Regions:
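Small-residue-rich transmembrane alpha-helices
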Residues: 276-298, 319-331
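Hydrophobic alpha-helical transmembrane segments in multi-pass membrane proteins
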Residues: 18, 22, 267-270, 317, ...
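Membrane transport/envelope proteins' first extracytoplasmic loop
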Residues: 1-276, 307-308
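Conserved G/P- and acidic residue-centered "switch" motifs that form tight phosphate/ATP-binding loops
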Residues: 151, 304, 329
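Amphipathic cytosolic juxtamembrane alpha-helices at the membrane-cytosol interface
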Residues: 13, 20, 301-320
């Protein structure tokens, strides 16, 4: 062992308390990086898998009233991989314990089969039975907040008529991970819920038999999203199209993506604080050590040690804490 290495070992032992403290701060920063980055990547993977399994739409468009045969023209558009149409309306819900009426967003489901775009996942209960007129599936967040479950009933005013509806299932959907009421910026699960109902029942109730007022598209990987939206707007314009928009502007996705982005930013900012504190402490310790050893440095240089060798000695001292922290994380 060289003289400088013996000197380094002696200094590290003498300052073991400070160096161990710095190593713990660095280890905390590294652990935070690994944990939060892993959490972010896991959440993103889960989001993408959920979107893929539920066939989450890439483009939405609302229209006043369009004939169902128009669907074939939309399917023939370049870049479109799948199309689904539906009937969608808002209605007042008669619920106890509220000082103002609650609102429900009624969305049609095919009576036979499942939606080709924006499917739902049952959490409890069953799917709507064919031929029934008063069965609904409730969004999970709303059902939880209102204490509703399959077997309960709920009263709604649908197109001016009060109807008692039987809750047969509770479901989730990527489209309504966060259900945001119209005119609001944030979800309100106590006053606003999603209710899925048979299209054969909901359509005639709003004079939408053989027609639709909402269309969702999934795009092929090589599709030009802007071009598809422009062409879709052109097709729907004569039927009172209200403007198509991409997934990036879909309210629930926008909120969820914002939370994921916040998670990613925090995964960078918090570790940076720990590592910054560690760097500050290490700078204090190293600076004090160099100031107190000016005489020793002069002696070393007098004995023929070059500036590079002396500098390497103090660099190894500075690296001791991060190396110790890294070794601790590997263990």
């Amino acid at each position: 062992m060289t003289s400088l290495m013996r000197k380094l070992s002696r200094e590290l032992w003498q300052l073991r308390g400070q160096m161990l403290s710095i190593a713990l701060v660095v280890a905390t920063g590294i652990m935070t990086v690994v944990t939060m980055r892993g959490s972010y990547e896991t959440l993103v993977d889960a989001q993408q898998a959920y979107y893929r399994d539920m066939r989450f739409a890439d483009v939405w468009a609302s229209v006043k009233r369009a004939p169902e045969p128009l669907r074939r023209e939309i399917e023939a558009m370049p870049g479109v991989a799948a199309v689904d149409t539906r009937v969608s309306f808002y209605a007042t819900l008669d619920l106890e314990g509220l000082d103002a009426p609650a609102q429900g967003h009624f969305i049609s489901l095919p009576e036979h089969g499942r939606p080709t775009v924006n499917d739902i996942r049952l959490r409890s209960g069953r799917y709507i039975a064919p031929g029934t007129s008063d069965e609904v599936i409730l969004s999970e967040n709303f059902a939880h907040e209102r204490g509703l479950r399959p077997g309960n009933s709920i009263r709604a005013v649908i197109n001016g008529r009060a109807r008692d509806l039987d809750i047969v299932g509770v479901a989730i959907s990527p489209e309504y991970t966060y259900a945001v009421p119209p005119g609001s910026l944030y979800p309100d699960d106590k006053r606003f819920g999603i209710l899925w109902m048979s299209r054969e029942v909901l359509g005639p109730a709003y004079d939408m038999d053989g027609a639709f007022n909402e269309v969702m598209l999934r795009l092929s990987p090589d599709a030009n999203e802007d071009a598809v939206i422009a062409r879709l707007d052109g097709l729907l314009d004569r039927y009172g199209g209200l403007g198509a928009y991409p997934r990036a502007e879909q309210p629930s996705h926008l909120i969820l993506q914002g939370e994921l982005d916040q998670n990613r930013v925090m995964g960078t900012a918090i570790p940076a604080v720990f590592l910054g504190v560690a760097a500050f402490l290490l700078n204090l310790v190293l600076g004090r050590l160099i100031r107190t050893q000016r005489g020793e440095i002069a002696v070393l240089k007098a004995f023929g040690y070059r500036d590079r060798e002396v500098g390497l000695h103090y660099l190894l001292f500075a690296l001791a804490a991060p190396v110790l922290a890294g070794a601790d994380e590997l263990d």
